[in-house]
A protein has these predicted regions:
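Hydrophobic alpha-helical transmembrane segments of integral membrane proteins
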Residues: 2-3
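A composition-driven surface/loop motif
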Residues: 6-15, 20-334
Length: 334
């Protein structure tokens, strides 16, 4: 038997979280392209200002300079790489279907600054194969363990008004790296687009440093975590509608050492905890979970609705938890 635990909280307290403050830049208009590329199974065809800012090797496109690059077409084994340290790059996905067999479909190199813009009204698909996993294929030196790989120190924004479907047959759907002294600050921001992720092996979205899911429509099916960040995970922002997130299947839904839900319409079906403030690699850390807005429907089949290994604060929003009526499964565990 399930029990329904509703928590209705008025936004009476002001948060001191900078994560929820400020306004979101919703500008995702399609950019004018410097170069247009068409992927085929036999190669990449360039049109526009050719021979500047990029390299083509068979079905591998490498971006080496700032600019706006539009990619379309279809390829059964190809990839896009943004070279280490390259900033001011906009990749426009304009009806692209791209599979990469043994590495990431898109790799953003260390210390790069990249906007991946999904063009208005287009449907795009990125995928990999089981070989893109160096745990299972240690001989594969090119494995990146994600369909979209954002390396340490990279700043990546995934946005636009189109639709992107990611199928992660190797390991993760999207993987974002860490902030380091050598490579700089790392972050991943998701905004506006329609994003579908099927991750039957591991996490749908996995970040090491800072992950902002500001807006858009996300549908996620994951074997492990749906949306995970080792440190700070922000969902929505104060004064905005926030994202619509539908997690149809996962082990844990939203997980971060500092987990902030500021706005959004979120449904989570999890075999363990729906929301979890934790990181097993951090032994001395002030874990926090703060809910200041949005609507959350949590369906934990074998865990807690909300599980914080530190403070749990609810100052606003609507929270509904459906949980088994057992001692091990609590609506709130803090």
């Amino acid at each position: 038997m399930k029990k329904l635990l509703p928590f209705l909280c008025a936004s009476a307290l002001a948060l001191s979280l900078t994560a929820c403050a400020g306004t979101i830049n919703n500008s995702t208009a399609d950019a004018a392209s410097d170069v247009t590329f068409t992927f085929t199974n036999s190669g990449v065809i360039a049109a526009g200002e050719t021979n500047t800012g990029y390299e083509i090797d068979g079905t591998v496109l490498t971006i080496t300079d700032s600019g706006t690059y539009t990619v379309s077409g279809s390829c059964a084994d190809g990839s896009i790489k943004v070279k280490k340290g390259t900033t001011g790059v906009t990749l426009v996905l304009d009806g692209l279907t791209l599979t990469s067999e043994n590495t990431a479909a898109i790799t953003c190199g260390k210390s790069s600054e990249v906007t991946i813009l999904v063009s208005n009204g287009t449907e795009n698909s990125l995928s990999d194969t089981e070989q893109n996993n160096d745990d299972n294929y240690p001989e594969n030196e090119n494995a990146e363990n994600a369909v979209i790989k954002c390396k340490d120190g990279s700043t990546v924004t995934l946005c636009g008004d189109g639709e992107l479907t990611i199928t992660a047959n190797g390991k993760n759907g999207i993987k974002s790296g860490a902030t380091t002294d050598e490579d700089g600050e790392a972050s991943l921001t998701i905004r506006d687009l329609t994003l579908n992720i099927d991750a039957p092996v591991n996490d749908a979205i996995n970040a090491e440093q800072l992950l902002n899911v500001e807006s858009g429509t996300l549908t996620i099916d994951a074997a492990d975590d749906a949306i995970h960040c080792d440190l700070v995970l922000n969902i929505g922002a104060d004064g905005t509608d926030g994202p619509t997130i539908d997690i149809t299947n996962c082990c844990e839904g939203l997980e971060g050492a500092e987990l902030n839900v500021c706005s959004g319409d979120i449904t989570i079906n999890a075999s363990d905890d729906c929301l979890n403030a934790a990181n097993s690699d951090l032994t001395d850390y002030d874990f926090t979970m703060t809910i200041s807005g949005g609507t959350i429907d949590a369906y934990p089949s074998g865990g807690d609705g909300f599980d914080s290994n530190g403070d749990l604060t609810i100052t606003g929003g609507t929270v509904i938890v459906w949980t088994d009526n057992t001692a091990d499964n609590e609506p709130l565990d803090a």
